[in-house]
Amino acid sequence: MSEAQPAKEGLAPKADPAWQHLPGVVAAQRRTLILLSAAQVLGGIGFGAGLSVGILLATQVTRSEGWAGVARTSTTVVAALVAVPLAVLAARFGRRVSLGLAWALATTGSVALVAAAELAGSNRVLASTLLIFGLGISGTGSAASLQSRYAATDLAAPEHRSRQLSLIVWATTVGTVLGPNLGAPGEALADSIGLAPMAGPFVIATAMQALATVVILLLRPDPLLLAGTYTQVDPHAPKSGTRAAMGRAWRIGGARFALVAMCAAHTVMVGVMTMTPVHMDHHGASITVVGLTISIHVLGMFAFSPLVGIAADRYGRLPLIAAGGGTLLAATLVAGLAGASMGWVTAGLFLLGVGWSLVLVPASTLLTESVSAADRTRVQGGSDAAMNVSAAIGAAGSGPLLGLIGFGGLNALSAAIVLAAVPLLLSARRLRPAARPT
């Protein structure tokens, strides 16, 4: 079946009797969404433990907050490095192999962190090596989580793409909420089996990520391979790698804007979020208040994503991305002017999470729709790599900027990053993609 002609770029596509409506495909998509959601919940719990308990373990092993931060950054770096290879693997062998391998590698990372916790008091060199390896390879779990949202669109009907992608984003909520709170139950588990207290959360993480791997291995039929049997690709089209595919995507207005929008939103979100606890601590906020603020921020990021997906399918991708940009601007204004008011800081962080979601869901869908079927998987991997690089830049740059220009200045600079994407939004509304895949 050939690819459909595009509607006006960025608007919600109209329903048509495409192959995605065939009963067998609908059943396969339903199964795919269930399995992807289950893997997101299970794997997310393990990855969430690394986000919070991991930095504590890193501080314990390295005995230096600076080196602990470097070790923690390895997770983001590896997530960026493996995004493209995982996408290439998916294009050749399907999502089942790609995502299954990623979660399996993340499982080995958690095992290494258990060993690092056990050796922290007796062999610091080996413990540090295992720590960096474990935190780094855990980044494959982050990459798998991001690429799972694209897997949800492989068999999705055009008019349902955003809402089905958003379900996978929403499933991440469970892991990001439960994972960071594994400290107490993890210590209790470690005590019961004779391990170091810090090893306990990673025993739980190992089990959860191993289960996520098993769930992904049940992904039959593979959604990407099944989609390939219906999507006609020009046999004379030149075979090319990710760089060429990204180059072609960059020449398409919608794809270019979607990529820039996701990277800008991710940079702003990570940069402001990373320094918010430091700002709150400077103004005397308790650890409980800081934790509550971050939890509310995470709630804004993920909890409303199904509503965002429904709205993007109904009203179009570009209007929702524009709304997300406006929400991010409001977030930087509220947080930047909050000063010592922890209530306003929390409100700003909540808006920051909502704005990120309003950009990520429709922009991911727009990127998928704007490129050809032949390039789609590689472009998706390239976009995830770019997002993780953006996260690393946001996290690394926010600390020095906080010291130089303060929290208000950091938010003002973040607002400028959002505004820089406006010209691309205007141009994307005038341009049409080369072809919108069905």
Where are these regions (language model features)?
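Juxtamembrane intracellular "pre-TM" segments in multi-pass secondary transporters
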Residues: 3, 9-30, 221-259
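C-terminal membrane-cytosol helix-exit motif in multi-pass small-molecule transporters
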Residues: 183-184, 206-232, 424-429
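Intracellular juxtamembrane helix-capping segments at the cytosolic ends
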Residues: 54, 143-157, 358-371
